[in-house]
Amino acid sequence: MRSSRVPILITLLASTLLFASCGQQHKAEQQVKAFIDENMEVADEISGRDFADLGTTRHISDSLIDVMRHRGAPLFKKQISYGAKPSGDLYYLRMSYIHKGDTLQNTFYLDSELQEVVAFK
């Protein structure tokens, strides 16, 4: 009797994890889209936005965040206002897009709550 419940429990747990990760992916994509609309100089000239899977990293130090913030990227405004530097793990999301026939890519780093983009390259 107990062994018949195991597959049901596994299915429920897997479904819960799947829905939670889909929600995080969607939230991250929305934050990046809002960041682009606000900070990209040519946001209305890009098409074909394609997002990779959301990932996490511990390998981004405060000094690396400073470097990315200072360098920025082509097509983006120079004086972007960021929030406070986060502590702990960061999420990252890669986005590919087309601008004037060229396929370009940027990586966006988000805080652990997926509330804001803290740096990008």
Model features per residue range: what roles?
Residues C22-K121:
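Cystatin/cathelin-like cysteine-protease inhibitor module
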Residues M1-C22:
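Sec-dependent bacterial lipoprotein signal peptides
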